[in-house]
């Protein structure tokens, strides 16, 4: 019979079978349509059959010693792949079988699943495709001469067969029974082409008929159950009839069109032609190819990997003779490999190893699948060994590496120590070795203060060596950025003892960069016109930096004026005018530094909330914020002594506030004095008298001059001061304004509460009070201070340990609902004061007031002098913790206020134990419950000046957190609040925009307290409407300790760092700031990134300062698109290493509204286009200071994604400049962006750069090599400098020629230093792409390590029982306690967001290294279903210095339980490596893949 390939008694009882019966080849469709798994190959077309130099990595390898029940050798079978599984069905040798075997290419294991349902008869030479987990089998030979046209579906999730009955086509008949056809998945449909039919009714009398018909099988939509056959109308010449050919599908790269490619087969003789069906137009064509085509063949395999088709084996003609082409009857099997580049249609015939033992034997009728970078071939007929009575089949399994490995996963931190980092990583599929590289994150010297002093305000004019320096600059930044990374030393190095009064005159440029970034913009023709055309233009606000040093007798004071942006309807201040910037004036102010106080006369307009921050290393940090007449106390974010006023505008899409915020910070108790008009007013500040000389008769708006009367010193004038008289009330505000800008006047109106007296027991701590003087007629007082913000000393005595405070409000105006909780933080149980008083004075209260007093050891009542009969208490004691977080929320006019309160006591609501310590929550009076904020303050445990974050509240419940050893505050805002203000004195605020997934609106206060401990553990960035960008902030080091809280925002519009706008300007995928403490790297920055060089402001804090800084209040920040942990049942926990918040600053950036996207640095739209490209990049350009986030568009398969910002440590100048640039209108951005580079030059330690993708790497960003490892873990103690081994060194290596690194010198790791790591996999083809970057930090001595060997057992009655091994013994510190955190479900509102959010709750704190989490808590646990259902725990240990790194562990659950939980978003990931993300505030956030082998005793 013509066309007989062989005589094979294999499939029936010794009967002869024509070649056409079984001369059919399996089709691998699974890979054909799976574009996500395609791998790019960098190959050149070889000359002839010679192996090109780029293809030298092609080496066959035989799989040795697989485990499990191996299938019997066979041919005529087919195989598809589902992920890393190869599924083999049918075929046979001594009879056709219905066996199904599965081979796991990762574990090298065969297994036989238990099948159920309508198991089909054994068949051979059938069609086999896969769509997701649905496999379809069509046709084939059932027995000799009997073919099938039945269709079966196999569901891989249940291994259940189902027979399908597809509908017939609308015109024509269903496909006839056949074998040797191609069955190819093209897009969402299955294409059936050709095959061999039997025209005889008698199976024994076989009459072969070659087919070339084309059918489409639709298995989607309404046809998903049974399917439907479609006979498409095609154009062009169809391929000739054939069988035993192959079909693959691919997409044209240029236009994305899907194509069906038919190759080879048999039709009486071997065929070697190619036919292309363009499925959009259904047009057949015969593509032209270049290169030397392989021999014609049938029963071969064609497999798509990447953009290439790999043809292996099959029957080929024995002799090529054109005259016998139609009658050729001699053939042979081959083991050659041919490669067709589908983009260029070029054949790349490859010559492989000729040693017989190193290559598969020649075969036909085998099966082949492509799994990632490998081509697997199994069994088939042995072409060299055939007999008349028996076919010999191969029983070997081979694979061929055809491309370099996929990009490696992110490295995980197992354990951190002072001089070593133990890392681990998940195996990259088919990688044989790994290259690990390291990059040190340079930590600038502690000279940021000097930078500021020199760069911002260096044009001072010395006037006296006995006075403090005052530097004044104008700035248009709308953000309240604290300037400077503050360490134990002063922010501004106090090198000059002379007074410096510098200003930016209109005609003078201090420096190009400083002038552009810090100097005010050109004055608008009118404030109104400016606001109309520039919604981002700023209202009036003044920024003062007053920095004092305990060690310095002549501290330098830096005053910076900035405008606060006013957006939308908020362009007008309450007075009807826009508060313009205080530009270019040279005030004459003498701040005399004494050992007791430093005083500054400050006045701002009523529309500008004023925050006074009083930090001190010896005492607690306090900030008093005044919004109109309301007070706000916010903690200091600095570890040094500085007085600052920063201006910011709280405005956003859903947040409206017409006032800016001024923050005044000072290191010592300060007095903010406001004088009322009298014939003469004197103020004693720091032992010096200041006289205000003015006319005896004062009319409203009298302009005054301050005269400094120090002996021997010249008198200099200050900008004129306006006194605005108020009817009915004596208080008047002193306004410091530019004499040329009437709209720039800001003022504070004092309040007067006649006859009120407050005298309560008070703690020996710092108490901030507002003192209102009594009323005098006729201006006869020589000295009147209408508002005194005073910190004084209180001598301890036995008055009962009750702290007291006073909030004075404008008279006649009800206070907004205020809840004040005061918690003392002694070593024992905390006591809560019952005598807290809020007084309302005059004016209008539109915000919330929060005062908390903690950490007292002794108390005393200390009455002051009576002013108008009102007695107030002041106290100040070094070493005592003070007021914590406050949130000033600007309320709308429709906000419901509580009744007018004057001296309203706060009533206790409930007492709880938090962190093992008693805490009492105070609830407001019922009359005040109509609106306002509830504030909860948790006790701190040490006196530490660590960064704190003051955040505005959205209308939803929010956490306000302090980042150091300070009490935690949780503030819940009512729905009526539509304005938010976030005065942030420096870039240390990290989580202004993170949504809370743990708090429901109806949560009782005690529930909130429970979640407060974990509040800071994991923060999700909330993307609000109109938010053009999303910033993922990694908390600096210790933003949440066990005794400090983290701020979680759940509002739709979250408050930006200094505005109520969203925090970052970039489009959502862009996460731009990189911070050392934001440990884990992020990759794929998709837009122009604004970066402050890879520098970390290393602030050396004393042990005392760091007591509470190390803590477990960790936050995992979820990227909007990334939230799913890595795969694998034995995923071990990610270990987080600690980075102190004081050692790294996060640059706060305000987001520009959508209509101002052009205001970003660089062109935002251009970079949005770049996003798509960079999302596909796993590797961040080493030169970029920002690491690009992988899958920022939501394309992750993990539940906790790479959310941590690589936070960029920036100097204050950089932060301010960047902030200003971001918020500046586009027209101004272009003119100013060019000057950013100049700041880079000026700020040596902290550079600001506009990062454009693919920038060249600088010297500090070179990667150094740790080594090449075949294991999946390594303890890094040293590395080889890049000068010895560069990146190009690894370009030519593969697994067979690994270098020897022992000859190179190595550099040891340093303690307390942050490093970046990246990993690359190596196989026989070479080195793959670099994976995502992770950042970890070596420990500082004295802190505990991470718990290990975590074991979790389940008790049906009690819950989950956790045990763990303590960290390695500390030399000097003992473990005091452990904290265990549990990931909890998101709230309903959070679920409604674009991306689910995750939060942690502390479920245990105690000294024992074991705990039981009750079922009640587990019922609220978040079940991560990204891979295998798991509950996530975190455990950290604490010693006397603080909390060490945490260990995260995933506890696998029953998959059935996962169905009851909403799975997290699982978008497509670039080639699929998975990783888990864990973050903490003081613990270096790490994001890594699970440890598949459960190393280090960590259990999944």
Swiss-Prot record:
CDD domains: FN3. Residues 1490-1500 have a biased composition (Basic residues). It is found in: Nucleus. Keywords: Autocatalytic cleavage, Cell cycle, Kelch repeat, Nucleus, Phosphoprotein, Repeat. Residues 1166-1178 have a biased composition (Basic and acidic residues). Kelch repeats lie at residues 85-133, 135-181, 189-237, 259-307, 308-373. One of its GO terms (cellular component) is ATAC complex. GO terms for molecular function: chromatin binding; transcription coactivator activity. GO terms for biological process: chromatin remodeling; positive regulation of DNA-templated transcription; positive regulation of growth; regulation of DNA-templated transcription. Residues 517-543, 1024-1061, 1161-1185, 1458-1500 are annotated as: Disordered. The keyword Acyltransferase does not apply. Optimum temperature is 20 degrees Celsius for complex formation activity of the N-terminus and 33.5 degrees Celsius for nuclear localization of the protein in vitro. Due to lack of HCF repeats, the cleavage process occurs via a different mechanism to that in the mammalian HCFC1. May be involved in control of the cell cycle. This is Host cell factor. It comes from Drosophila melanogaster. The gene is Hcf.
